[in-house]
């Protein structure tokens, strides 16, 4: 603070010196003009220009908008000394106004000297805290295990026979099912081993028990035979199937009777089977449950596994060679085959021991960077790779407590060795064996601590030195007892969500960062306070006012009374009531100057004017005892209100803002780092496929198999229609089959002829039953009736008027022609009614001969058909007819002759 006052004094002094050197000496300004007593002439030499007198502090000026210092007025000598002094006073007032209004809230304080009524002391240094940190940080690699929810899967083979009994009633043109009975029968063990697996055939009969009664079904209601197994038409990706028949057998047709038909279809099907913990049962892909452990058997103590069936229903075959029913190839290596018969089917599968076929834990994550830290009574395993933190106890977890956990140690060692060889083989060494911890949420952590090669060498050297210092006959420390093998086993249940571990990791991440940051802040703050306390204890001896004001939090005055400080409260003074004088020289003592600028102030706006001296940090001193010898080159900056005043050669020069002075920071940097960004990646304990596959029964697979069963083992495209002639053909075929080879040959011919006749009749019947065929037949009948009607009319017309019927055009021309031209030449024709009688007689004769020729030809044709005698008789008759004389009579006139002539 004193440095600032000294600079201000130097500035004012320099300004006064510059003004004094440029202006002549002048009398002091009257106090009444400004209410301020100011020195107008500098001691030690003439002044060509009096320094400007500052304006009263009560005058308010407008607020400055720029912080650049105003240019100094040019030192041109005015024509009048009084005018020069007035101009200098105005300039100084303007500068002071700008300084005051730059920071309007800057207060001046009058601090009376303390009397010792109030004394204070400083607190002693405190003991700084230590920030909390984790203990026993250990780096290493880890393998995280979770509960194995996947079922145990294996292949099984089903043997069963589909029995279908259908009751059909046959009508004349249709058939109707009156009932269909369907059932499944198991295949006996002997037939599976001796027939199906050895020869690839199956018996056509099915013997099974229903309602505690044994029954037998015969395929096609015939005697027992061996039927060959053939591959199913449709094979899935996971299973194959074989069967003996495609079509259902229907009974022969007998109209108006109920008939029964039996179909036995032997089916062998490979299916997937699955079983879940505790493996007391398994289910097939068809949806059939088997209430027996898949590990049940008669070897290696497996008879203790669960079963719900009688002993005679189960059979275990050692040295079983399975056969591929498609290629007929035999397996190269034998297996132990389990066979179980149920009321509906027989199932077979390869037996394997329970250990190590199944494991209740499975590997989840392999973490190549895992940090273990001890917090209180727990371990926290954190990994940035998977953004999780696992919390465990400080004690290790024994693997012997895990039921069916043989795979944990094996898989953990393999994964740890693989990660170590890939990343840490050249830089680290393993510390001991893998350690196992059970984390919250059901996660088992296999942790392998690591140590860098450098630290390992240091530890080895230290260990060797400790061994050298120990006595030779020291008793070795007892080894830790191995965990008891009789400890109760349990199954670890793993939660399906990892969010709690993610939240724990986030909390630990934030907690570690915040605790570290707050710890550094607390330590730095405490140390800083202790350092400042030492400085304050020393600084209070130099400037007790500043130290006391900073400590109390408000402006006070203080002085040391031994080891304590006496303080008194300072009185604030409004900035408008304070003015600074332009000279720092003591007029009555040449060579002596004030070290701080002189000021005049009022406590109140209308109060009396008090002379004083500007102290440090806007303090107004009531005395003017701050003196110093005048020096050459004096320059000082003093805090005045919200800015600085500059004195040069103990005279006011100009003003400037605080921003124009370079600031040197005295703060201690606080090491606070921002929380680093961390992105969470999706992390699933169990994938969607694992959750879907965790159930004992896959309903999708069951429905798919049930709906695909008919497509695989039945012919759905062949249709057997109702046929009334089927019984007849079946009887004929059976009749000719019983007559040997000759009967079969004759039967083929007869069957062909009968088939043709039946086909023709069936074709006509089908054509007539068709609506379009019936319409065509109706149209043909109608056309025949119309033709018969016209033929009948023609015959009637021919009988009534043959000439008109035979020669309609000729008769029509004769009717329309001139009757006079028809008679021909001469008058005889005219007299005879227009007709020539001779020609008419010739026409009649021609017609008679035509009838005679027709009769002779018919007689000869009939005689040729009858024989030689008839032909001779016909010849004689013809000769007689040719020799016959003409008739000797004259034609009689018909009474209708006139009508006939009209028609002609």
Swiss-Prot record:
InterPro entries: Glycoprot_B_PH1, Glycoprot_B_PH2, Glycoprot_B_PH2_sf, Glycoprotein_B_ecto_C, Herpes_Glycoprot_B. GO terms for biological process: symbiont entry into host cell; virion attachment to host cell. Pfam families: Glycoprot_B_PH1, Glycoprot_B_PH2, Glycoprotein_B. SUPFAM superfamilies: Viral glycoprotein ectodomain-like (SSF161008). Residues 168-174, 253-260 are annotated as: Involved in fusion and/or binding to host membrane. GO terms for cellular component: host cell endosome membrane; host cell Golgi membrane; host cell plasma membrane; membrane; viral envelope; virion membrane. Residues 793-904 are intravirion. It is found in: Virion membrane; Host cell membrane; Host endosome membrane; Host Golgi apparatus membrane. Residues 716-769, 728-768 are annotated as: Hydrophobic membrane proximal region. Residues 1-22 form the signal peptide. Residues 23-771 are virion surface. Glycans are attached at residues 82, 136, 393, 425, 486, 671. It is a single-pass type I membrane protein. A motif (Internalization motif) lies at residues 889-892. A motif (Golgi targeting) lies at residues 849-852. Residues 60-70 have a biased composition (Basic residues). Its main location: virion. Keywords: Disulfide bond, Glycoprotein, Host cell membrane, Host endosome, Host Golgi apparatus, Host membrane, Host-virus interaction, Membrane, Signal, Transmembrane, Transmembrane helix, Viral attachment to host cell, Viral envelope protein, Virion, Virus entry into host cell. Belongs to the herpesviridae glycoprotein B family. Envelope glycoprotein that forms spikes at the surface of virion envelope. Essential for the initial attachment to heparan sulfate moieties of the host cell surface proteoglycans. Involved in fusion of viral and cellular membranes leading to virus entry into the host cell. Following initial binding to its host receptors, membrane fusion is mediated by the fusion machinery composed at least of gB and the heterodimer gH/gL. May be involved in the fusion between the virion envelope and the outer nuclear membrane during virion egress. This is Envelope glycoprotein B. It comes from Human herpesvirus 2 (strain HG52). The gene is gB.
């Amino acid at each position: 603070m004193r440095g600032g006052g000294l600079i201000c004094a130097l500035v004012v002094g320099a300004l006064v010196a510059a003004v004094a050197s440029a202006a002549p000496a002048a009398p002091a300004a009257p106090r009444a003009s400004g209410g301020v007593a100011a020195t107008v002439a500098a001691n030690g030499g003439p002044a060509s220009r009096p320094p400007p007198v500052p304006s009263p502090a009560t005058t308010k000026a407008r607020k400055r908008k720029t912080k650049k210092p105003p240019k100094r007025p040019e030192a041109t000598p005015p024509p009048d000394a009084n005018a020069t002094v007035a101009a200098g006073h105005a300039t100084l007032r303007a500068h002071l106004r700008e300084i005051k209004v730059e920071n309007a809230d800057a207060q001046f304080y009058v601090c009376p000297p303390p009397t010792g009524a109030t004394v204070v002391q400083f607190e002693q240094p405190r003991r700084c805290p230590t920030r909390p940190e984790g203990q026993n940080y250990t780096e290493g690699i880890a393998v995280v295990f979770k509960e194995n929810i996947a079922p145990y899967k294996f292949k099984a083979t089903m043997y069963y026979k589909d029995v279908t009994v259908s009751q059909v009633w046959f009508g004349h043109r249709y058939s109707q099912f009156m009932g269909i009975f369907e059932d499944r029968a198991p295949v006996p063990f002997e037939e599976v081993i001796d027939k199906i697996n050895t020869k690839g055939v199956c018996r056509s009969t099915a013997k099974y028990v229903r309602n505690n009664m044994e029954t037998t079904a015969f395929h096609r209601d015939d005697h027992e035979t061996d039927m060959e197994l053939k591959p199913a038409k449709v094979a899935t990706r996971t299973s194959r199937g074989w069967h003996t028949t495609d079509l259902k057998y229907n009974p022969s047709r007998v109209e108006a009777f109920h008939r029964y038909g039996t179909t036995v279809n032997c089916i062998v099907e490979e299916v997937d089977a699955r079983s879940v913990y505790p493996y007391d049962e398994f289910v097939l892909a068809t949806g059939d449950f088997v209430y027996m452990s898949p590990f049940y058997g008669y070897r290696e103590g497996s008879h203790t596994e669960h079963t719900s069936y009688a002993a005679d229903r189960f059979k275990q075959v050692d040295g079983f060679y399975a056969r591929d029913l498609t290629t007929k190839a035999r397996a190269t290596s034998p297996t132990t085959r389990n066979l179980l018969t149920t009321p509906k089917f027989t199932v077979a599968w390869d037996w394997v021991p329970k250990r190590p076929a199944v494991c209740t834990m499975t590997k989840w994550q392999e973490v190549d960077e895992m940090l273990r830290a001890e917090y209180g009574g727990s371990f926290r395993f954190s990994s940035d790779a998977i953004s999780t933190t696992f919390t465990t106890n400080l004690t290790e977890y024994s693997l012997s407590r895990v039921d069916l956990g043989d795979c944990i140690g094996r898989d953990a060692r393999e994964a740890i060795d693989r990660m170590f060889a890939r990343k840490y083989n050249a830089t680290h060494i393993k510390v001991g064996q893998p350690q196992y911890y059970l984390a919250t949420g059901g996660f088992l952590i296999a942790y392998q601590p690591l140590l860098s090669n450098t630290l390992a060498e240091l530890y080895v050297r230290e260990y060797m030195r400790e061994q050298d210092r120990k006595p030779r006959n020291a008793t070795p420390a007892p080894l830790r007892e191995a965990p008891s093998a009789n400890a109760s086993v349990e199954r670890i249940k793993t939660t399906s969500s990892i969010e709690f571990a993610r939240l724990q990791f986030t909390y630990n991440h934030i907690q570690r960062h915040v605790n570290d940051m707050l710890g550094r802040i607390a330590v730095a703050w405490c140390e800083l306070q202790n350092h400042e306390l030492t400085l304050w204890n020393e600084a209070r001896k130099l400037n007790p006012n500043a130290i006391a004001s900073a400590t109390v939090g408000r402006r006070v005055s203080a002085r040391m009374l031994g080891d304590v400080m006496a303080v008194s409260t300072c009185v604030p003074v409004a900035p408008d009531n304070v003015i600074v004088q332009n000279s720092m020289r003591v007029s009555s003592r040449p060579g002596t100057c004030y070290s701080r600028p002189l000021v005049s102030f009022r406590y109140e706006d209308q109060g009396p004017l008090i002379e004083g001296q500007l102290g440090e940090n806007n303090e107004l001193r009531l005395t003017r005892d701050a003196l110093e010898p005048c020096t050459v080159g004096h320059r000082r900056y003093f805090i005045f209100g919200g800015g600085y005043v500059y004195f040069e050669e103990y005279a006011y020069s100009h003003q400037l803002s605080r921003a124009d002075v370079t600031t040197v920071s005295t703060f201690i940097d606080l090491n606070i780092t921002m929380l680093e960004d961390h992105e969470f990646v999706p992390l699933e304990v169990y994938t969607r496929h694992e959750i879907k596959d965790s159930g004992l029964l896959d309903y999708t697979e069951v429905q798919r198999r049930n709906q695909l069963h008919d497509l695989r083992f039945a012919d759905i495209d062949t249709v057997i229609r109702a046929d009334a002639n089927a019984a007849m053909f079946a009887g004929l075929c059976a009749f000719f089959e019983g007559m040997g080879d000759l009967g079969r040959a004759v039967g083929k011919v007869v069957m062909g002829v009968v088939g043709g006749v039946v086909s023709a009749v069936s074709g006509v019947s089908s054509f007539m039953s068709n609506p379009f065929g019936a319409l065509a037949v109706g149209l043909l009948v109608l056309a025949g009736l119309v033709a018969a009607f016209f033929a009948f009319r023609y015959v009637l017309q021919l009988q009534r008027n043959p000439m008109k019927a035979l020669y309609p055009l000729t008769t029509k021309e004769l009717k329309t022609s001139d009757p006079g031209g028809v008679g021909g030449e001469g008058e005889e024709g005219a007299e005879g009614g227009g007709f020539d009688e001779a020609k008419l007689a010739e026409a009649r004769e021609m017609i008679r001969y035509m009838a005679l020729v027709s009769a002779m030809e018919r007689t000869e044709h009939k005689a040729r058909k009858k024989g030689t005698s008839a032909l001779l008789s016909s010849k004689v008759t013809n000769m007689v007819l040719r020799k016959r004389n003409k008739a000797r009579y004259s034609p009689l006139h018909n009474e209708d002759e006139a009508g006939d002539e009209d028609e002609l």
